[in-house]
């Protein structure tokens, strides 16, 4: 078999694929100047996962996924990659890929949520094993460094920077719009110049800065600087509030359920259930953030698997409950368009004459959900940078700890600027899909990492073991690649461009400063 790396200088090849041993990773994490405080238990870790997974989507996306949709993409760039490939194979052209249609799942969207939870659990199990085995901040970046080598570690680290930053820019802009709308309902109208993105949908809006989007990031930054214990405590409160809002909806909405609305249960059969699952899959993204907290966990071998798996289970139960109640309150076709599609839960409660106080609770739950998402992803972003800096792939500034709070204070401020300023300037629109492709790519490498470590280090103690290796990790890889193929072509192009920028930085800076550079 020819050596495909034969044209790569031997020294560079050795460095690109050099793996950092788990023992070395753990030893580096114990350095007095770079040691994070350990204060997170299983409840806080589970709350981190719930905080990241459940945003406002539980109140918004369920109705659209149940009702289905039909639309035409404006260009081939906005067509799904899988549709482009299938149309070319079947018809010899690409034009058919512009027509998108997702059949209605109907009340069976609850089954879609269950199937997606099972699919996500394959990746979740892989994260649980590696997080219990390698209790280091860095998540998929650290796991890749231990299994696939420095080059892949850099690629996934750079990918995670994109995932967390772009996702939070989108959430911050969404929060600002929601916040402005709620103030307006009370007669308080914010100036558009200071509460609207400067750039939206390809043109200047005339605004100066989206101040609410920036301020929510700034205030969360102050909280994160205080320490992980304080941040986790605040997240626990917010998670409790949004779960309470969901439970109140389940009780109030449950009294308004008419079983006749559940018929037909699956109007489009299994196809509708599967396509509905493709829509709601991304409501489960976020459980991987728990793994960035491994280094600050008191008992990571036991608690990391609990946090990851428990957060998935809790969120799945809440999603299924909301789906069944919402689609029992009104026929699924009601949520196909208009205000019912934009805010199905609020629409259903208002249409059925529920007291405004309950609507206010839903609003509080949605806004709290967005803030907790912002908090958790800002936290995770900083821990990724911290780990990359400690490995000398980023400047030392990113791993500097505050002498009093023991938090990566410079990284936290840089993350504030990297997310807060773009959130004040741009409405990134469908570029938010970069979060989805970045997450799925991380899932693929983590799943592969489990297989690699089972072969290279089978005797190392594991607090949790994925069953049926390599079958379960391979199922995770196939599912994630399939979902990636369902994303838009423009998303793939943006992703490749971002990785290209990252490779330029790696070969121009990081590779020369890595601890493997001199070896």
Regions found by a protein language model. Name each.
Residues 2-106, 121, 125, 136-137, ...:
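Membrane-interface "cap" regions at the ends of multi-pass membrane proteins
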Residues 20-37, 70, 77, 81, ...:
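Helix-loop-helix junctions that connect adjacent transmembrane segments
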Residues 59-62, 122, 136, 159-177, ...:
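Membrane-helix boundary/coupling elements in multi-pass transport proteins
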Residues 60-201, 311-314, 495-499, 503:
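Extracellular loop-to-transmembrane helix junctions
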Residues 72-105, 142-143, 149, 180-192, ...:
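TM-loop-TM module centered on a large, flexible mid-protein loop between adjacent transmembrane helices
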Residues 176, 208-256, 267-270, 308-312, ...:
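Membrane-interface loop-to-helix entry segments
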Residues 181, 246-249, 385, 435-462, ...:
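Hydrophobic alpha-helical segments of multi-pass membrane transport proteins
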Residues 205-208, 220, 267, 397-409, ...:
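C-terminal membrane-solvent junction of multi-pass transporters and transport-like membrane proteins
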């Amino acid at each position: 078999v020819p050596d495909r790396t034969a044209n790569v200088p031997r020294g560079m090849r050795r460095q690109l694929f050099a793996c950092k041993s788990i023992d070395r990773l753990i030893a580096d994490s114990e350095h007095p100047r770079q040691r994070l405080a350990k204060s997170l238990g299983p409840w806080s870790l589970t709350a981190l996962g719930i905080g990241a997974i459940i945003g406002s989507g539980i109140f918004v996306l369920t109705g659209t996924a149940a009702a289905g949709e039909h639309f035409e993409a404006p260009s081939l760039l906005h067509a799904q990659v899988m549709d482009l490939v299938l149309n070319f194979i079947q018809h010899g052209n690409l034009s058919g890929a512009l027509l998108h249609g997702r059949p209605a799942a109907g009340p069976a969207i609850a089954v879609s949520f269950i199937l997606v939870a099972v699919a996500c659990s394959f990746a979740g199990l892989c994260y649980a094993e590696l997080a219990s085995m390698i209790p280091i901040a860095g998540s998929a970046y650290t796991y890749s460094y231990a299994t696939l080598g420095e080059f892949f570690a850099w690629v996934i680290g750079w990918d995670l920077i994109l995932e967390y930053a772009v996702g939070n820019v989108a959430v911050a802009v969404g929060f600002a719009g929601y916040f402005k709308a709620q103030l307006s309902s009370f007669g308080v109208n914010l100036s558009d110049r200071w509460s609207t993105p400067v750039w939206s949908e390809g043109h200047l809006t005339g605004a100066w800065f989206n101040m609410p989007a920036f301020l929510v990031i700034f205030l969360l930054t102050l909280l994160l600087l205080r320490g992980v214990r304080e941040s986790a405590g605040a997240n626990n409160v917010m998670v409790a509030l949004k779960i309470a809002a969901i439970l109140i909806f389940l009780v109030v909405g449950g009294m308004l359920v008419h079983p006749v609305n559940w018929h037909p249960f699956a109007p489009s059969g299994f196809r509708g259930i599967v396509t509905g699952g493709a829509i709601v899959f991304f409501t489960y993204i976020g459980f991987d953030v728990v793994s960035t907290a491994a280094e600050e966990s008191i008992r990571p071998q036991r608690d990391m698997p609990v946090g990851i798996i428990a957060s998935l289970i809790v969120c799945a139960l809440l999603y299924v409950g909301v789906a069944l109640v919402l689609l029992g309150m009104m026929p699924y076709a009601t949520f196909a368009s208009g205000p019912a599609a934009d805010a199905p839960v609020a629409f259903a409660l208002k249409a059925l004459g529920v007291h405004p106080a309950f609507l206010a609770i839903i609003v509080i739950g949605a806004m709290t959900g967005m803030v907790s998402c912002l908090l958790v992803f800002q936290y995770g972003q900083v821990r990724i940078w911290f780990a990359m800096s400690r490995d000398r792939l980023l400047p030392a500034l990113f791993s500097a700890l505050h002498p009093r709070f023991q938090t990566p204070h410079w990284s936290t401020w840089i993350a504030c600027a990297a997310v807060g300023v773009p959130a004040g300037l741009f409405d990134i629109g469908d570029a938010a899909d970069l979060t989805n492709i970045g997450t799925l790519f991380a899932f693929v490498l983590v799943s592969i990492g489990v297989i690699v470590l089972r072969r290279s280090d089978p005797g190392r103690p594991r607090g949790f073991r994925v069953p049926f290796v390599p079958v379960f990790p391979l199922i995770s890889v196939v599912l994630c690649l399939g979902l990636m193929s369902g994303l838009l072509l423009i998303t793939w192009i943006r992703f490749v461009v971002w990785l290209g920028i990252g490779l330029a930085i790696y070969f121009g800076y990081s590779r020369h400063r890595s601890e493997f550079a001199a070896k």
